[in-house]
């Protein structure tokens, strides 16, 4: 009986700690998020972003690169630095640095959800199967329903994403992590 009670308490504490990681979005936050959503739709149409995604889609994903292998790479590796220093990486870093309290990460992905450019190394290389990629790639502007720690930065974040289009065709996704405490 005592061990069952201890187990129940353990399960409840573990569940409660997981709940504390996510937080509701307030009406004030939503108003600010909506402003960012409008902004990222414009960013997703920037010719530098569109051209980088078109080129990356033509090359394809890095051969044999999966999420497990990606996690083993040092963020200072030249491969990773290339995503930050290519034309799209420089542009998204400029956008983030213009709003350092509001934006903590930007990631550009191609049509196979492979990374094209980013401001800092994301936790995964392939985003397919995640709502932030799948919803935006279907042509919708996507928003995370609550704030929670970003997997790579651990900053309490609300992620938003917009489709990157070439004409009317969706060719990639622009993901922006907003710092929840500044919304």
Per-region residue spans from a language model:
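Solvent-exposed, extracytoplasmic
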Residues: 30, 79-102, 178-183
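Amphipathic coiled-coil signal-relay and dimerization helices
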Residues: 114-119
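Bacterial N-terminal signal peptides that target proteins for export
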Residues: 1-9
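Conserved beta-strands of PAS-like sensory domains
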Residues: 155-183
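Juxtamembrane extracytoplasmic/periplasmic/luminal helical "stalk" adjacent to the first N-terminal
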Residues: 22-76, 100-102, 142
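Short hydrophobic alpha-helical segments used for membrane anchoring or interfacial signaling
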Residues: 105-112
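Extracytoplasmic/periplasmic sensor domains and loops in membrane signaling proteins
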Residues: 77-93, 120-149
